Amino acid sequence: MKLENLKSKEGSRHKTKRVGRGFGSGIGKTSTRGSKGQKSRKSGHTRPGFEGGQTTLYRRIPKIGFNNKNFANNYNVVTLNNIVKLNLANVDKKVLVEKGLIEDNKLPIKVIGTATISKPISVSAHKFSKGSVATLEKSKSKFVVIK
């Protein structure tokens, strides 16, 4: 089988409709648009939601809610389980970037979750969840809060 011998399945391909190419084609002159009116003009279609000049539904309904995403505190979230899997004594921002556990180097780091820790480790991050603090204290590990 060669590339030039391939044929598409019967009925799967249609010829493109070439409109406005003379009377003999059957779709010349008005090009299937009808004779007059807004939709027959070149830019005759209205935007989505247009109601003929009447105030549209999305503008009649009052605005509700509030979005605080511009002022939200975003963190690089790292699970304590992933930190334990690294099997290192000291874990800080530099190590987390090298190992690929955090993507954005500019954002602060938050450690969450619980894990079984066999030997004490030292973790430095900007924030810790209550569960992660309890787990680290239980295993006599050190956690440093970065300012």
Curated annotation (Swiss-Prot):
SUPFAM superfamilies: Ribosomal proteins L15p and L18e
Region of interest: Disordered: 1-54
Single biological process term from Gene Ontology: translation
Keywords: Ribonucleoprotein, Ribosomal protein, RNA-binding, rRNA-binding
Domain of life: Bacteria
One cellular component term from this protein's GO annotations in UniProt: cytosolic large ribosomal subunit
InterPro entries in UniProt: Ribosomal_uL15, Ribosomal_uL15/eL18, Ribosomal_uL15/eL18_sf, Ribosomal_uL15_bac-type
Gene3D superfamilies: 3.100.10.10
GO molecular function terms listed in the Swiss-Prot or TrEMBL record: rRNA binding; structural constituent of ribosome
Record's compositionally biased regions (Basic and acidic residues): 1-13
Feature: compositional bias, Basic residues: 36-45
PANTHER family xrefs: 50S RIBOSOMAL PROTEIN L15 (PTHR12934), LARGE RIBOSOMAL SUBUNIT PROTEIN UL15M (PTHR12934:SF11)
Assembly information from the UniProt record: Part of the 50S ribosomal subunit.
Family: Belongs to the universal ribosomal protein uL15 family.
Function according to Swiss-Prot or TrEMBL: Binds to the 23S rRNA.
Full protein name: Large ribosomal subunit protein uL15
Record organism: Malacoplasma penetrans (strain HF-2) (Mycoplasma penetrans)
Lineage: Bacteria, Bacillati, Mycoplasmatota, Mycoplasmoidales, Mycoplasmoidaceae
Gene that specifies this protein: rplO
